[in-house]
Design a protein with these regions (language model features):
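Sensor-regulatory modules in signal-transduction proteins
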Residues: 207-209
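Juxtadomain coupling helices with adjacent low-complexity linkers
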Residues: 174, 180, 187, 198, ...
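N-terminal helix-turn-helix
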Residues: 1-81, 242-247
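Amphipathic alpha-helical effector-binding/dimerization core
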Residues: 63-161
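Short, basic/aromatic recognition patches
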Residues: 87-95, 158-203, 240-243
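Short amphipathic alpha-helical signal-transduction/dimerization elements
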Residues: 22, 143, 147, 151, ...
Length: 249
């Protein structure tokens, strides 16, 4: 791909355009995209036009831009995330019948926890996670499980960075976090009260595929709820997911 005067390749500029979309910002104008990418207006408009033609972006009747169905279609073809989600969903539903709060599936992606699925009871308490949303690894129960079982080099890289406090109870001391990760690996789950929201407790367990941790399965409970039933339900669900992944269901 040809480079721009700034040194960015066309691929990098396309990624910058696509990265302006978030779970909260699903519609934009081409001018807003140009401003958020820092690309020249003519360049951003041209890239947006090309992506619309290819079906990767779509325009509505008011000329606002959104992600296109073609992008979704391509993302699902042969996706390991789709296979994982399909294996996990029946077991997540079983957890929901017991817990009746929020049940979530997350994977490690670019040093963050990326949420592939979330089931929520209508009367469930507070929860900021969204499908296709991300949370810091050190500040969520799912992220803590993923970080505990991550490649040691990645784990040390995360521990060497400033650990942002999402709530007053987020673990931001690297030494304390390192000890917590060791405990998670030893006991096979984490209970993280108040790490994201003080009114909630996150409980998470690892999900393995042929021995390798590929995801975290978690629930978000009201702070006053006992975590033991959630731990039992999650561990049983994780075993079921692992069996289905092994059998190729």
């Amino acid at each position: 791909m040809a480079n721009s005067r700034s040194g960015d390749s066309m691929t990098e500029r396309i990624v910058r355009v696509l990265d302006t979309f978030t779970t909260e910002r699903t519609m934009q104008t081409a001018t807003e995209i140009a401003e958020r990418t820092g690309l020249p207006s003519s360049t951003a408009h041209r890239i947006v036009g090309d992506l619309v033609t290819a079906g990767l972006l779509e325009r509505d009747e008011e000329m606002r831009i959104r992600l296109g169905m073609r992008l979704w279609e391509l993302a699902l073809r042969g996706s390991s995330a789709l296979r994982l989600r399909q294996a996990a969903l029946p077991h997540m539903e079983q957890v929901q019948t017991v817990i009746r709060e929020h049940t979530q599936l997350a994977v490690l992606e670019h040093e963050e926890a990326l949420f592939l699925e979330r089931l929520s009871h209508p009367d469930a308490g507070a929860n900021i996670t969204r499908i296709a949303g991300r949370l810091p690894l050190h500040a969520s129960s799912s992220g803590l499980v993923l970080l505990a079982h991550a490649d040691p080099a990645l784990r040390e890289r995360v521990l060497s960075l400033p650990l942002r406090a999402v709530s007053q109870e987020t673990v931001t001391d690297a030494a304390v976090l390192r000890r917590l990760l060791t405990t998670i690996r030893r006991q096979g789950y984490v209970v993280a009260p108040g790490s994201i929201e003080q009114v909630s407790t996150g409980v998470a367990v690892p999900v393995r595929d042929r021995g390798e941790v590929v995801a975290a399965l978690s629930v978000v409970l009201p702070r006053e709820s006992a975590p033991a039933p959630a731990v039992d339900a999650l561990l049983a669900a994780a075993r079921g997911i692992e069996q289905d992944l092994r059998s190729g269901r």
